[in-house]
């Protein structure tokens, strides 16, 4: 699935008149493309408030990031759980009205989650870097900044806000971008979870030989529907390669019951990222225990 970057001139002049109309190539083809295009604007606005140089100075005073990979690998719960804090989504709207990031983070840690994922996209998911900062103050678990990263600036901002790891999405980044952004994260000693949606994207990632955390997203980017067959089919083909290369495969999205977890664990999935299943339930603790006590 090709995700285009925002055209530099979203409007075109009509003859000599003093107005412009939208360029036909300036219309996003899908929600993912719309999100990515908005990131360009968002990053420019962030830079007006805090410069990259100021972020770098702040990072120099921070402790070493926590080990995301190790926490999943050594998790007592199998597969290891990346529990997500997410208020809303483009497809479902507000998922959790009673949204208290601090209490949710404390709950996740007490239940045995390996790591916590925090949505920081504001426009489409009602997240923020302020929420990430709140969660950082509330837990000792490694934190993943869950966003649509297209710029090094976002990585530095994530680190300053308390993230130990970032998400890179293969569908929105070229190979050169993936290598460059991974290098930035490596320099900051941050972990990188790279996300794929199909075999073509996974092949790209494996050829780069740079990633030891690979997330298989079960969500179709065109329809936003989820299907665990994505993880199952890719694991059937690539499980041995993951094992040989010490790659931790993580299944993301569409995990709703203990049977789902058992089927994923049985095919070699080492970690799961679960958000909406917890967020839509009034009692997160009960929802968590219902998923994990029987496996």
UniProtKB/Swiss-Prot annotation:
It holds the Pfam family IGPS. The keyword Transferase does not apply. GO terms for molecular function: indole-3-glycerol-phosphate synthase activity; phosphoribosylanthranilate isomerase activity. It is an enzyme of class 4 (lyase). Keywords: Amino-acid biosynthesis, Aromatic amino acid biosynthesis, Decarboxylase, Lyase, Tryptophan biosynthesis. InterPro entries: Aldolase_TIM, Indole-3-glycerol_P_synth, Indole-3-glycerol_P_synth_dom, Indole-3-GlycerolPSynthase_CS, RibuloseP-bd_barrel. GO terms for biological process: L-tryptophan biosynthetic process. Pathway: Amino-acid biosynthesis; L-tryptophan biosynthesis; L-tryptophan from chorismate: step 4/5. It catalyses: 1-(2-carboxyphenylamino)-1-deoxy-D-ribulose 5-phosphate + H(+) = (1S,2R)-1-C-(indol-3-yl)glycerol 3-phosphate + CO2 + H2O. Belongs to the TrpC family. This is Indole-3-glycerol phosphate synthase. It comes from Prochlorococcus marinus (strain MIT 9301).
């Amino acid at each position: 699935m090709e995700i285009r970057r925002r055209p530099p001139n979203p409007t075109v002049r009509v003859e000599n008149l003093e107005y412009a109309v939208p360029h036909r190539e300036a219309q996003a083809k899908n929600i993912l493309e719309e999100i990515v295009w908005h990131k360009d604007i968002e990053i420019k606005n962030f830079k007006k408030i805090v410069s990259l140089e100021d972020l770098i100075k702040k990072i120099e005073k921070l402790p070493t990031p926590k080990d995301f990979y190790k926490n999943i690998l050594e998790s007592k719960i199998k597969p290891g759980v990346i529990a997500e804090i997410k208020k809303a989504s483009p497809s479902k709207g507000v998922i959790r009205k009673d949204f208290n990031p601090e209490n949710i983070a404390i709950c996740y840690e007490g239940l045995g989650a390996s790591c916590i994922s925090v949505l920081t996209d504001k426009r489409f998911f009602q997240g923020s870097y302020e929420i990430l900062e709140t969660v950082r103050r509330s837990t000792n678990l490694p934190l993943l900044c869950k966003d649509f990263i297209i710029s090094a600036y976002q990585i530095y901002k994530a680190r300053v806000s308390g993230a130990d790891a970032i998400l890179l999405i293969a569908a929105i980044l070229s190979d050169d971008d993936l290598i460059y952004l991974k290098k930035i994260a490596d320099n900051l000693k941050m972990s990188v979870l790279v996300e794929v949606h199909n075999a073509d994207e996974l092949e790209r990632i494996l050829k780069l030989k740079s990633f030891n955390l690979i997330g298989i997203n079960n969500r179709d980017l065109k329809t936003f529907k989820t299907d665990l067959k994505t993880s199952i089919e890719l694991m059937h083909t690539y499980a041995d390669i993951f094992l040989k290369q010490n790659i931790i495969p993580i299944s993301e999205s569409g995990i709703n019951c203990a049977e789902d977890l058992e089927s994923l664990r049985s095919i070699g999935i080492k970690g799961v990222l679960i958000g909406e299943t917890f967020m839509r339930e009034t009692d997160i603790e009960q929802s968590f225990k219902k998923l994990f006590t029987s496996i």
